[in-house]
Every structure is written in C-alpha cells, then in structure tokens.
Amino acid sequence: MRFTTLSTAFLALAQNVYAFPIESDLSALDVTLSQVSDTRIKAVVKNTGAENVTFVHLNFFRDSAPVKKVSVYRENNEVVFDGIKRRFQLQGLASESLTTLEAGEVLEDEFDIATTTDLSSGGAITLRSNGLVPVVKDGAVTGYLPYSSNDLKLNIDGAKASTVTKALKPLDRRTKETCSNASRKSALEKALSNTVKLANAAATAARSGSASKFSEYFKTTSSSTRSVVAARLEAVAKEAQSASSGSTTYYCSDTLGYCETNVLAYTLPARNIIANCDIYYSYLPALAGTCHQQDQATTTLHEFTHAPGVYSPGTDDLGYGYSAATSLSSSQAVLNADSYALYANAINLGC
C-alpha cells in the first residue's frame, strides 16, 4: 500500500446496537430496468409496500456519483466495474443523502453503463440489480428493504460504446505527494496498525476459531469458505502493514471529489485506490468500543476488501450493517465488504 494524497483538490452499549431489522416481506423496492438508447439505461424504482419509506440513496439509484447501480454480465461473467464504492455513516444522516417514497410512488434514474464499464467489444450483455437498501428514521439507519430488478438483455454496439466518456479520469501522477497533513497522517497510520491487528485476529478466528461465530457472519462452517475468508483477511493485514509498497494507493484526503455529506471513505476497485473523507477523522473513533459500531480501523479494513489488488475478486456492498450483512447467503457474505468489517469487530470485542 502506498500512503499518499493529492496536492490539489480534485452506539449504544449492547451487542445488537447496530443490529437493525429487515423490513417486512410485504415492503420492498421493485426496480424495472429498460434501455433508453445504446448504453443509456433507465431505472424505475417503486415502493411496493403499504407505507412511506425513507432510505439512503448513496451507492443506489439517484446517487449522482459513478457508483455501481447495476451489475453487467457477459456470458455469465461479470464485467469489471470502473467506478467508486462509498462507505457512509449510519447515524446523523443529512437529508441530501436520503430519498423518501410514498406507498406506490416511484423514482426514475437514468445513467450510462459505458461510463463505468468497458463495453468496447460490444455484443450481448445482461444487466441486473439486487440487494438491500438502508431504511432511515430520524436520521439513523433503522432497518433495510430488499430490492431486485428484471434481467435486461442488450446487444451492444461496441463502436458507439467506446465513444462514451468515462466517469473516472486518469490521475495525474505529478500531483501526488506524501501525506502532508500531520494529524491525518498520524490518524491513518494508527488506523492501519489497528487494521493489521484486527485482520490478523479475525483471520486466525476464521481458520480455527468458533464455528458458530463464523457462521453468524458468513452463514456456513465449511472449511473452504473459512479458508477464503481467512486468506482475504490475511491479505488485508499484509497490505496494511506498509505505507510505501503494496497493491493499493491510499490517500489521506479526497482525490476525485466524491466525499459528499455522510461519506466516510471510498474505493476505486478497478484502480486499487482508496481515499478517506473528512468525517473519517472527525466522526469515527479509532477503534469501536461497542459491537458493530463503525470506526476508523474497520472502515479501512472494509475498503481494503473492495480492492482486487489486495485479494481477488474484490468485495461488493451487498449488505450494509449487521442486520443486512447477516441476512445474506453464504455466497453473498463472502463477497460482502461489511461482513469482514463486522466479523473483525466482533472478534476484537468478543461480541
């Protein structure tokens, strides 16, 4: 890991503090995907429940950043996503990060998949979107709603797709310098040290610790899954050990302007780049003192798991927070970033 920045700007006391419920099966968001033109897609998100819902739209439809709104598949293999994955706070959420839909109401979002996916080879692809979106009351995440879409099959004109401007621009390496903010550098160095400790302890627990505790977070006790989880955590620990080498570049501050309100940090997985936001330092404690609470160390661990250069494939954000993460299947949990952060926190605190 290379520790750097850009010189120009481009809680409660019990184990279940953050164990939020999944909303009723009668409540859900239905997503309908359709083609507007070429690689431009329209998503219509409908609240199919009987009550109004307010949810976090970061990393979801209506987010204006180049986040992963759909998965793109070619011959059953997912095409590499070249955008950002953002981690946000669970409490004190501002209105600009939230969307409210009344019962039966819809929101529409249009986006171009070619801005975050290389489709220059053209041909047949399939789009789909599913997961869990955090529900908010009084500015705090209190539960989760499932969402799912239709499969949208497209035949892409590669020549047209290649003319679409990419969302992420190449970084100018000449603007890069050693992290010059002494306070942030010190905080991140401490977070990296804590990440090494937490990841190594969690890796040991994954290989030979409590089977029931492992199953709580990864929904299986199979030796093969335990080995994969342990290997990914060991890779995270190795990456966090050095500030001058490794597969990732870690910025003390925002590099591309994606640190909006409530965003703690983000990763560009296709480029193995991680960046912290201002509230990583002002909102998060160095280490959590309660189970499933967010902190700097597990946020850094979470971001490292997104980077395929650390361990391939990189993780996704399939379930955010304890309740959503522990509601995933085993195959989903092993690819869910927060499952690793939550498990490491649990092992550290004896949750």
Curated annotation (Swiss-Prot):
Q: Which residues form the propeptide?
A: 20-174
> Family, per the entry?
Belongs to the peptidase M35 family.
Binding of Zn(2+) occurs at: H302, H306, D317
Q: What is this protein called?
A: Penicillolysin
GO terms (molecular function) for this protein are: metal ion binding; metalloendopeptidase activity
Cofactor(s) annotated in UniProt: Zn(2+)
Sites of glycosylation? N52, N181
Q: Which gene encodes it?
A: plnC
Which Pfam family name is an example for this entry? Peptidase_M35
Cofactor: how bound: Binds 1 zinc ion per subunit.
Keyword annotations from UniProtKB, A to Z: Cleavage on pair of basic residues, Glycoprotein, Hydrolase, Metal-binding, Metalloprotease, Protease, Signal, Zinc, Zymogen
Source organism per UniProt: Penicillium citrinum
**What is the residue range of the signal peptide feature?**
1-19
Can you tell me which residues form the catalytic site? E303
Q: What's the Enzyme Commission number for this chain?
A: 3.4.24.39
Q: Which reaction does it catalyse?
A: Preferential cleavage of bonds with hydrophobic residues in P1'. Also 3-Asn-|-Gln-4 and 8-Gly-|-Ser-9 bonds in insulin B chain
Q: Would the keyword Metal-binding be found if you checked this record's keyword annotation?
A: yes
The answer to keyword Cell membrane applying to this record is: no
Mention one GO biological process in which this protein takes part, according to its record. proteolysis
